[in-house]
Amino acid sequence: MEDRKRIVANHYEPLLNKYSRGYEILDWESLDCQVKRFEVLTKNVNLSGKKLLDIGCGTGDLFGYLNNLSINLNYYGIDILSKMIERAYEIYPKGRFFSGNIFKESPFSKKQFDVIFCSGVFNLNMGDNEIFFKEALPVFFSHAKEKVVFNLLDPGHFVQTDKYYFFNQKEVLHLIRQYSDDVITVTGYIPNDFTIIADVKKQQPS
């Protein structure tokens, strides 16, 4: 777990010093690509009146995006890097951001949120992404009452490099079936990405 944090810090913290715009700090291809990932969430999930947790919130850009849409919801963001959270508060002082490793020790209660959103957390190749993803699923679903939404890189539409990690859609769907009976896969918004939108089972695996 500490190796993952070190890898993430080594990759993203230099970008904090180099760039001022959130999508560049988070190593997205462009602002448009970042926004299109957010649009998948807002176009497919009714967020009005909901409590949402943004896992891997970075500099809080989803908070700013949702504010611009005037969606009435309770937003919370958490990131493993404290420097990201410091920057998030600089940009969005009215946001609710937390620094911590939710996969190791969560500061939140079970089923505290209606919707869990996680964008880009699994993109960087950490050497054990499959294990990390399997560990993350029960964390996602234990904190959500209604829906879990996350995106992953698609190996079929991208020149693969060792820097990033790509997931097989069929394998992801197989893993998630124990947590959800209603799963939607969204593709086509950008070539190298897919988003999973999963309803939360009332009875979760122990």
What are these regions (language model features)?
Residues M1-R21:
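N-terminal, positively charged/glycine-rich alpha-helical extensions of SAM-dependent methyltransferases
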Residues L31-S48:
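Conserved alpha-helix/loop element of class I SAM-dependent methyltransferases that forms part
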Residues L53, T59-E105:
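Class I SAM-dependent methyltransferase SAM/SAH-binding core
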Residues F108-V115:
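A short acidic, Gly/Pro-enriched loop at the edge of an enzyme's catalytic core
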Residues V115-D128:
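A short SAM/SAH-binding and catalytic strip from SAM-dependent methyltransferases
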Residues N125-L137:
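A short, conserved alpha-helix within the catalytic core of class I
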Residues A144-L153:
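Conserved beta-strand signature within the Rossmann-like core of class I S-adenosyl-L-methionine
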Residues Q160-S206:
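Class I S-adenosyl-L-methionine
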